[in-house]
């Protein structure tokens, strides 16, 4: 029995699922840290912080940077820095800087993963409504989807500022299902992180976990999605469509 035979709509996470956004996010984080005269983190480290929205990303970046600065100063025999600005205020300042820099680098630092456009097109052609649920700040979402030429596939888009409770809370997924006019159990949610799978479980949606995303360095199977796929186009046979073999470059 096909466990997805009752699916009437599909919703996707964005970062780490449809797009590799780490280059742009890491560049903006590092520029913001540098502007505050803090150590820069680098893409490999920033990848482990992605997934809970920009505010949490800033908190993680600042916590690491302050600790790294303290370690560096101790190694050099220098006294620790006595911060005049409380950490909460530094997070707020860092977020404002990040938003400015990310607006400059988001498009050039974000790429579609292979098979994304073909898969979205095939699902849309089948008549399935498609939704997007991301914790990314809402103002960045629509321009990015347009630049990547995938905005046309989505009938519902929920950004991080569109709901009070972000993933892993179920509210964003429940809102998408409501706008699609279907029950949560009829909406398949596809993501790459434990936040995605936890949100799907809490909302009552069947879930697909993809192995190639970020997920804080954890294997997606630890979150126990209903199905695990290596590639996004593995969705197609599960939903009664032929498997797409068209290759798309990372820079498409």
Swiss-Prot record:
EC primary class: hydrolase
A cellular component annotation (GO) from this entry: cytosol
Names of the cofactor(s): chloride; Mg(2+)
EC number: 3.1.3.18
Source domain of life: Bacteria
Quaternary organization: Monomer.
Purpose of the protein: Specifically catalyzes the dephosphorylation of 2-phosphoglycolate (2P-Gly). Is involved in the dissimilation of the intracellular 2-phosphoglycolate formed during the DNA repair of 3'-phosphoglycolate ends, a major class of DNA lesions induced by oxidative stress.
NCBIfam families named among the record's database cross-references: HAD-SF-IA-v1, HAD-SF-IA-v3, PGP_bact, PRK13222.1-1, PRK13222.1-2, PRK13222.1-4
Protein name according to UniProt: Phosphoglycolate phosphatase
Organism whose genome encodes this protein: Escherichia coli (strain K12)
Gene giving rise to this polypeptide: gph
């Amino acid at each position: 029995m096909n466990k997805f035979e009752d699916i009437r709509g599909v919703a996707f996470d964005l970062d780490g699922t449809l797009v590799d956004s780490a280059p742009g996010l890491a560049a903006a984080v590092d520029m913001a840290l540098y502007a505050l005269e803090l150590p820069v983190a680098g893409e490999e480290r920033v990848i482990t912080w992605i997934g809970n929205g920009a505010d949490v990303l800033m908190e993680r970046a600042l916590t690491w940077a302050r600790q790294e600065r303290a370690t560096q100063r101790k190694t050099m025999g220098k006294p620790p820095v006595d911060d005049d600005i409380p950490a909460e205020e530094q997070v707020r300042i860092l977020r404002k800087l990040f938003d400015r820099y990310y607006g400059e680098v988001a498009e050039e630092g974000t790429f579609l993963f292979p098979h994304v456009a073909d898969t979205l097109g095939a699902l849309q052609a089948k008549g399935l409504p498609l939704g997007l649920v991301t914790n990314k700040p809402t103002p960045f979402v629509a321009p990015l989807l347009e630049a990547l030429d995938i905005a046309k596939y989505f009938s519902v888009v929920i950004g991080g500022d569109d709901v009070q409770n972000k993933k892993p809370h179920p509210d964003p997924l429940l809102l998408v299902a409501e706008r699609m006019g279907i029950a949560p159990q009829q909406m398949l949610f596809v993501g790459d992180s434990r936040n995605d799978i936890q949100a799907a479980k809490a909302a009552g949606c069947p879930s697909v976990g993809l192995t190639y995303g970020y997920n804080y360095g954890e294997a997606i199977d630890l979150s126990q999605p209903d199905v695990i796929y290596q590639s996004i186009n593995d969705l197609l046979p599960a939903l009664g469509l032929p498997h797409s073999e068209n290759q798309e470059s990372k820079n498409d």
